Regions:
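Select subsegments of transmembrane alpha-helices in polytopic membrane proteins
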Residues: 19-27, 96-105, 146-151, 214-224, ...
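Membrane-embedded alpha-helical segments that form the functional core of polytopic membrane enzymes
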Residues: 28-76, 111-112, 123-134, 169-190
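Transmembrane helix-loop-helix
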Residues: 49-58, 102-143, 218-278
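Short, membrane-interfacial amphipathic segments enriched in basic
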Residues: 1-9
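Small-residue-rich segments of transmembrane alpha-helices in multi-pass membrane proteins
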Residues: 26-34, 91, 149-166, 208-213, ...
Length: 301
């Protein structure tokens, strides 16, 4: 058990672990890169976008709402995480449940206040998003398949806020979003396989617990093949510059992923597959820069 009086630094590290600060930093980077190189109008330069006050407030509100979402999710999953993630849970518990809940409400309050400086619609949007995250943590995640789809949808919504702000509804953005959404659903299902022991012990009705590992693997396989649809569309119908190398490389990785998925049986093997999917997502964020190298140079000048 954590010490009775952990230092302030330990509590900060614990809170950073609870809110998964590393994930939030990647999301912030992804929102800004997508804004600069995909979503924002071409006439806006990189500096104009980077120092756009309303965009900054939207990204900040997104980060706070996501952080609060991780907190409430951690609160509801505390028992099964003792089995599934004992080391992380040990670190997380340097902050009490009471402090976590207080932080959850404070972050949500600040998020809504920040949104109010953008527009009333932003307040409605983020209020609905906060409620949706709570609903997912409290109810939806306990429903096989629907829980996985809900988690992936909630992960994509912050990007929706950005392209609504810039009023850019080009088809290419939705195709990119569909690819990301499918990979996120796959990742959620792999997490269920990875956490099978703890979920089973807590009678948590995930897809592998309810219908078995083979059914979960079959569902993941179908989703992997579905990811090839947006990839083909992006390669054939749109100009995505050197990012086509990313999608070709990702397709190869997903084929290898499928092979290892069907021979995997242990938690460590599923964790390796989970990390491979994380790599695909984070690498994809960085490869946004490859869509148009000329635009990258122009926007950064």
């Amino acid at each position: 058990m954590p010490s009775q009086n952990p230092s302030f630094l330990l509590k900060l590290v614990s809170l950073f672990s609870v809110v998964r600060g590393y994930n939030i930093l990647v999301i912030i980077l992804a929102q800004y890169l997508a804004s600069i190189f995909i979503i924002a109008p071409d006439h806006l330069g990189g500096k104009e976008i980077l120092f756009n006050q309303n965009l900054f407030l939207i990204v900040l509100a997104s980060a706070l709402s996501i952080a609060s979402g991780y907190i409430i999710n951690n609160f509801y999953d505390s028992e099964k995480d003792l089995i599934n993630r004992p080391n992380k849970t040990y670190i997380d518990n340097y902050v009490s449940q009471k402090t976590k809940l207080a932080t959850y409400f404070v972050l949500n309050f600040i998020c809504v206040i920040i949104a109010s400086y953008v527009a009333f619609q932003a307040v409605v949007f983020f209020s609905a998003y906060i409620f949706a995250i709570w609903l997912y943590s409290h109810k939806l995640k306990k429903i096989p398949i629907l829980g996985n789809i809900s988690a992936a949808t909630l992960a994509v919504i912050p990007f929706f806020a950005v392209f609504v702000y810039f009023r850019n509804f080009d088809l290419v953005i939705f195709v990119h979003a569909m690819f990301l959404f499918l990979v996120l659903v796959i990742r959620e299902l792999v997490k269920d396989l990875e956490n099978l022991r703890g979920d089973f012990a807590q009678d948590y009705p995930t897809l592998p617990v309810t219908y078995g590992e083979q059914t979960a693997k079959l569902a993941i396989s179908v989703l992997v093949f579905l990811t090839f649809v947006p990839v083909v569309i992006l390669l054939q119908k749109f100009e995505i510059g050197y990012m086509d190398f990313y999608f070709v490389f990702t397709t190869i990785l997903l084929v290898l992923f499928l092979y290892f998925l069907w021979i995997s049986k242990s938690k460590s093997q599923y964790l390796w597959l989970h990390n491979l999917l994380k790599f695909i997502i984070v690498f994809g964020v960085l490869c946004i820069l490859l869509i148009d190298v000329d635009v990258v140079i122009k926007k950064l000048i």
